[in-house]
Regions:
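Single conserved hydrophobic/aromatic residue that forms the stacking wall/gate
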Residues: 1-7, 11-12, 91
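Gly/charged, well-structured mid-domain segments that form the phosphate/adenylate-handling core
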Residues: 8-40
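Active-site beta-alpha connecting loops in nucleotide-dependent enzymes
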Residues: 21, 45-116, 159-163
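Active-site glycine- and acidic-residue-rich loops that bind
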Residues: 38, 42-45, 68-74, 125, ...
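Short, well-ordered beta-to-alpha junction loops that form the rim of enzyme active sites
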Residues: 67, 147-151
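Short active-site-adjacent structural elements
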Residues: 73, 102, 131-133, 152-157
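Short, flexible loop segments at boundaries between secondary-structure elements
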Residues: 163-177
Length: 177
């Protein structure tokens, strides 16, 4: 009886050491010598926690790509812009789920917070192009974080959910599509 419990505990411990939750600090393999991660951080508190934690690993540079959902509190946009601008080396502002809002209106709200902290940033509304920008500019020792979408595999525009999985976008970029 004891032997079966010990065996089970060891299996559980081994499994816990290798478990990966989709969209939470999910590392995506790329041909580059930088680290690319997908995380669901979609508010200021989770983004601050993520960036503060990543900074402890002493990356050469942190790229933080994110957008904010439409038809949601505007304050979240300002706050996330400020947090990323303060804690990342480069903030890449893009589209998330604009829902029934214009993507550039959401991006402009995010930029209010970005400007408050006065960090370096670029604005690329098309999420695939924004990801491509990060992948092309990241270098050895850098960490690229794609924040906000996490496990989601869609982008909601004007009430319609369109398939969009960041993992697929990354693969398309790698393959030159």
């Amino acid at each position: 009886m004891l032997r079966s419990l010990v065996g089970s505990e060891m299996c559980i411990r081994d499994r816990l050491n290798t478990i990966q939750v989709k969209g939470r600090l999910e590392i995506i393999k790329t041909p580059g010598d930088y680290t690319l991660m997908i995380d669901y951080a979609h508010n200021a508190m989770s983004l601050e926690s993520l960036l503060t934690t990543i900074r402890k690993y002493n990356p050469k540079k942190i790229y933080c790509l994110f957008g904010c959902g439409g038809n949601r509190a505007k304050a979240r946009r300002y706050e996330m812009g400020e947090v990323s601008s303060k804690l990342a080396d480069l903030t890449v502002v893009t589209s998330d789920n604009p829902r029934n809002e214009e993507p550039m209106d959401i991006i402009n709200d995010i930029l209010i917070g970005v400007h408050k902290a006065d960090g370096e940033y670029v604005t690329i509304p098309d999420r695939k192009e924004a990801i491509k920008y990060c992948m092309e500019h990241a270098g050895a020792g850098d960490i690229v974080i794609l924040a906000g979408k996490g496990h989601e595999d869609y982008q909601e525009i004007k009430g319609v959910k369109h398939h969009m999985d960041e993992r697929d976008l990354i693969q398309e970029i790698i393959e030159g599509r």
